[in-house]
Swiss-Prot record:
The chain crosses the membrane at residues 9-29. Induction: Up-regulated during erythroid differentiation. It comes from Homo sapiens (Human). This is Regulator of hemoglobinization and erythroid cell expansion protein. One of its GO terms (biological process) is erythrocyte maturation.
Length: 172
């Protein structure tokens, strides 16, 4: 009887020690992976910051930004509230702090502000067969009797066992 108790006791100790060692092992792997990911993301940010030139305080703004400034002054809306996330004393400080990641800043700097002129809608009298407003009949398939179909958990487990639903063609 003493040997049976000793065997159970040994088994419990082995199980507890193995669980503790597994937890330590997973914690160490998690720590090493997080440091590796932080190092890689730091390298990516450094590479991106080297590629993106920082705008100088006397940076020339595109015409669309000037127009937006004019419309905002007409409406008496403060510029810092609409363009920048963080309040600061100088515009260059708020520009640097408003965009924490360089790729997002790069995306806004590379925008081409060209003037787009739309043609008059009267000139576009194109009666193409693909015009969605001129389609006389369109077909769509809808479920005829949705109340008859009872949801079942097994449809998600095995789609081959699902019963087919009735569909009918409807003209719109």
């Amino acid at each position: 009887m003493l040997t049976e108790v000793m065997e159970v006791w040994h088994g419990l100790v082995i199980a507890v020690v193995s669980l503790f060692l597994q937890a330590c092992f997973l914690t160490a792997i998690n720590y090493l992976l997080s440091r590796h990911m932080a190092h890689k993301s730091e390298q990516i940010l450094k590479a991106a910051s080297l590629q993106v030139p920082r705008p100088s305080p006397g940076h020339h703004h595109p015409p669309a930004v000037k127009e937006m400034k004019e419309t905002q002054t007409e409406r008496d809306i403060p510029m810092s509230d609409s363009l920048y996330r963080h309040d600061s004393d100088t515009p260059s400080d708020s520009l640097d702090s408003s965009c924490s990641s360089p790729p997002a800043c790069q995306a806004t700097e590379d925008v081409d502000y060209t003037q787009v002129v739309f043609s008059d809608p009267g000139e576009l009298k194109n009666d193409s067969p693909l015009d969605y407003e001129n389609i006389k009949e369109i077909t769509d398939y809808v479920n005829v009797n949705p109340e008859r179909h009872k949801p079942s958990f097994w449809y998600f487990v095995n789609p081959a066992l699902s019963e087919p639903a009735e569909y009918d063609q409807v003209a719109m």
